[in-house]
UniProtKB/Swiss-Prot annotation:
Binding-site list for Ca(2+): Y27, G29, G31, D48
Organism per entry: Gloydius halys
Family the entry assigns: Belongs to the phospholipase A2 family. Group II subfamily. D49 sub-subfamily.
Protein origin, superkingdom: Eukaryota
Function, in words: Snake venom phospholipase A2 (PLA2) that acts in vivo as an anti-thrombotic agent. Inhibits platelet aggregation induced by ADP, arachidonic acid, and thrombin. PLA2 catalyzes the calcium-dependent hydrolysis of the 2-acyl groups in 3-sn-phosphoglycerides.
Gene Ontology cellular-component annotations: extracellular region
Coiled coil: none
Record's cofactor remark: Binds 1 Ca(2+) ion.
Gene Ontology BP terms: arachidonate secretion; lipid catabolic process; negative regulation of T cell proliferation; phospholipid metabolic process
Single GO term (MF): phospholipid binding
Protein name as it appears in the record: Acidic phospholipase A2
CDD domains in UniProt: PLA2c
Keyword Metal-binding: yes
S-S pairs: C26-C116, C28-C44, C43-C95, C49-C124, C50-C88, C57-C81, C75-C86
Length: 124
């Protein structure tokens, strides 16, 4: 679920997904089009693609299980679909953490769809 995604971002990247990633570049936030603008935006693009491959459950609403082991997030549970959602969220949170030094809110916060032409979109 989106609430769990926020939790994973806080645990892994030590940032609020709502305040840092909900309206950034062309892909961080609801929907997405155009070219990813930087490494952080690419994290969101890959996350959107990952969600797009999930079938049989709702990535934004379904609750999954995870645990922390030696500082790492481990996705668990018996439902393979929910585990897949967790893996999408886990990978994005790690990507955000690994690209924190490249995050550029002055340039890409509230970037706007007008700067993300649909015709420049790339496939997943």
């Amino acid at each position: 679920s989106l609430i769990q995604f926020e939790t994973l971002i806080m645990k892994v990247a030590k940032k609020s997904g709502m305040f840092w990633y909900s309206n950034y570049g062309c892909y961080c936030g609801w929907g997405g089009q155009g070219r990813p603008q930087d490494a952080t935006d690419r994290c969101c693009f890959v996350h959107d693609c990952c969600y797009g491959k999930v079938t049989g459950c709702d990535p934004k609403m379904d609750v999954y299980s995870f645990s922390e082991e030696n500082g790492d997030i481990v996705c668990g549970g018996d439902d393979p679909c929910k585990k897949e959602i967790c893996e999408c969220d886990r990978a994005a949170a790690i990507c955000f953490r690994d690209n924190l030094t490249l995050y550029n809110d002055k340039k890409y916060w509230a970037f706007g769809a007008k700067n993300c032409p649909q015709e420049e979109s790339e496939p997943c």
